[in-house]
Regions:
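Amphipathic alpha-helical segments
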Residues: 13-29
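Ser/Thr-rich, low-complexity intrinsically disordered terminal regions
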Residues: 29-55
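Terminal, regulation- and interaction-focused segments at domain boundaries
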Residues: 1-16
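C-terminal structural segments of small proteins and small subunits
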Residues: 70-106
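Short, low-order "capping/linker" segments at domain edges
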Residues: 104-118
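Extended Gly/Ser/Thr-rich low-complexity repeat segments
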Residues: 22, 26, 59-64, 80-92
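A generic structural signal for beta-strand entry/edge sites
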Residues: 3, 42-46, 64-68
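Beta-strand/loop substructures that line and gate deep hydrophobic ligand-binding cavities in soluble
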Residues: 53-73
Length: 118
């Protein structure tokens, strides 16, 4: 499954992880066609974007000063769509702090599921 990572510099990584997870959990509650699986606690988060797109995002806010994002998709098109969704939301939520998301190849550590969430 193709995957990419991003390290987003921020003084408030836990805040942005929580906002992302709460936003998509709220979307799931409000729209029956967007039943995302969302889990988060202790500086880690997970969003499964099915049925909108076959892909997911894992987040880690445990490292000081950085929000680590790891996205995957069933194929390259799904990966690209998940990246666009996540980037758009992180940059919108972090507009006041000037957050930007730049994707690169996934590290082996992230691709092995070290988050301890689904």
């Amino acid at each position: 499954m193709p995957s990419n990572d991003a390290r987003v510099a921020t003084e408030r990584p836990t805040l942005y992880l929580t906002r992302l997870c709460e936003h998509f959990a709220d979307q799931s509650r409000r729209h029956s066609d967007q039943e995302f699986e969302v889990a988060f606690d202790e500086g880690k988060g997970f969003i499964d974007f099915a049925p909108v797109v076959n892909g997911s995002c894992r987040m880690d806010a445990r490292e000081e000063g950085v929000l680590i994002l790891s996205v995957s998709g069933i194929d390259d098109a799904a990966l690209e769509r998940v990246q666009r969704i996540v980037s758009k939301h992180v940059e919108r939520f972090g507009r006041g702090d000037g957050l930007t998301v730049e994707w690169g190849p996934a590290s082996e550590q992230h691709s092995r599921g070290w988050f301890g969430l689904p």
